[in-house]
Amino acid sequence: MIPRYKVQEIHDIWKTENKLNTWLKVELAHLESLARNMTDVTLSVDELNIIKENISIDIDRWKEIESETRHDVQAFVQMLEESVPHTSGRWIHYGLTSSDVIDTSLVLMCKESLTIIERYCADTLFYLTNLIKSDKSSNKILSRTHGKAAEVQTYRQVFTRWIAGLRRAFDAVRLAKTSLKYGKLSGPSGNHTTNCLMNEANALRTLSLYPMTCSQIIPRDYFLDYFYAILKVVLAVEKIAYDIRIYSIDGVNEMSEPFKKGQKGSSAMPHKKNPILTENICGLSRLYKSYMHTAIENCLTLLERDISHSAAERIIFKDSAHIVCFILKRLSNVLKDLNINEDIAEQNAAIFENMTSSQDIMNDRIKEGFSRKFSHDVSQNEIEKNNF
């Protein structure tokens, strides 16, 4: 992610150092399973301990090897073997293929990211709840359908709907965390040619994961749970931001984002107070939707494996998490200092008071015994004449 929209907690998960540490975590879980289960591998527990005591990551050396091999996982495995001063290092990556390490690590990093996203969602929900508790939440504000005056409601009703949308998204994030419970250590083509089912299951258990039926890679539709959960949050945040933008339009002006002292809205028009924060949220939401489309396209791979998805995934997995956390944080800052112009909202509601009571007028006639069509027609005519 470019520095402007980077979120540090997400960066810490997806940065190269942590990615390689996660790869190492997967490799060590596999070695542990090889050494402690009855297999034809002669890796002893003592040799395993030698590996664990000496194995280390040297990023510079990894990059040096990769420049020659042009294969990041092969370079990683070679670097690890070089760090172990013993022949036992030959068992590193035994029976595995690169996708075993990459895809299982992806699952772990996605789960970590969702935990951070959960926290940011909770923070935003906190500020939304504070709005409901405010004295101004009971004030009247006009509801609008199709952009036209509908009925009078309260600010609390607006805020409650915002909360409901974000809570649905929050639930989707939690559900995605529970669904991301499978990994893959079944080797080339997913056939368990060298690494048996028992070894795979035991290694994955160490990582709090389960084995899955798949080819050489974890099917990309499996990761759609991650992207879909983020999409739900993005859509909920975008809706709130978009509503605030509408409420801040001149002539409406019932709510607006904070405008700080010394802030400028335009280089040419000094009077301008543009809703740049909520507009920024909507812009980043558009970007995320393009990532969601890419994630869907990545689900199609050639037979047992290809890497057509790889280049895009190096961007969309981490940047998706950056985007959603950034816009959640930005929305929290907007909500914390949201301008609620209750007097203007009251005036706007009063202007349309006759029209917004049309349902009550129609219902009164229905209660008097008139047909619904007659009641609707008469009420509509009276409203148009403003004759009540």
Where are these regions (language model features)?
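A helix-coil-helix interface module used to build multimeric assemblies
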Residues: 1-192, 197-200, 263-266, 276-280, ...
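Glycine-rich cofactor/substrate-binding loops
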Residues: 1-26, 64-70, 269-388
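A general structural motif at alpha-helix termini
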Residues: 48-52, 248, 259-262, 349, ...
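Charged, flexible cofactor/metal-binding loops and thiol motifs
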Residues: 103-118, 122, 133, 147-301, ...
